[in-house]
């Protein structure tokens, strides 16, 4: 596929093709080096300004220019679930869940704990089989 560097249509097509193969790509922060990783290796994704930060289970980070809503749409049939306006979490990496009050939930991913907002709690419960 040939295109200009900012052709969002082609970027979207490439992103969807990678998802079919169970992979996602991102840039190593501060470089132009693109790296392809398995979806299974991604623990969570969060927004940081105009960048989606892909957090790998190893602790490494990659960056993507895709919007979180685009990634959510692309990852809809995978283990990823929206947990807040800023985050998507791979449920395969969740090691514990606790109530956090006001309908929120604490999701443990190894040593990292993320807060799931009340808005997304029911979908998380449904996906893990609590409801």
Regions found by a protein language model. Give the residues of each.
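…primarily DNA-binding HTH/wHTH and HhH modules…
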Residues: 129-130
């Amino acid at each position: 596929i040939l295109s200009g560097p900012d052709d969002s249509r082609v970027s979207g097509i490439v992103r969807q093709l990678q998802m079919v193969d169970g992979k996602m790509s991102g840039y190593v922060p501060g470089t132009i080096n693109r790296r392809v990783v398995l979806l299974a290796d991604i623990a969570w994704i969060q927004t940081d300004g105009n960048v989606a930060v892909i957090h790998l289970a190893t602790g490494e980070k990659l960056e993507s220019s895709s919007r979180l809503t685009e990634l959510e749409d692309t990852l809809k049939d995978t283990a990823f679930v929206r947990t807040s306006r800023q985050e998507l979490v791979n449920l395969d990496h969740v090691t514990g869940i606790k109530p956090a009050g006001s309908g929120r939930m604490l999701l443990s991913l190894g040593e990292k704990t993320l807060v799931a907002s009340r808005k997304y709690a029911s979908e998380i419960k449904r996906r893990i089989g609590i409801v």
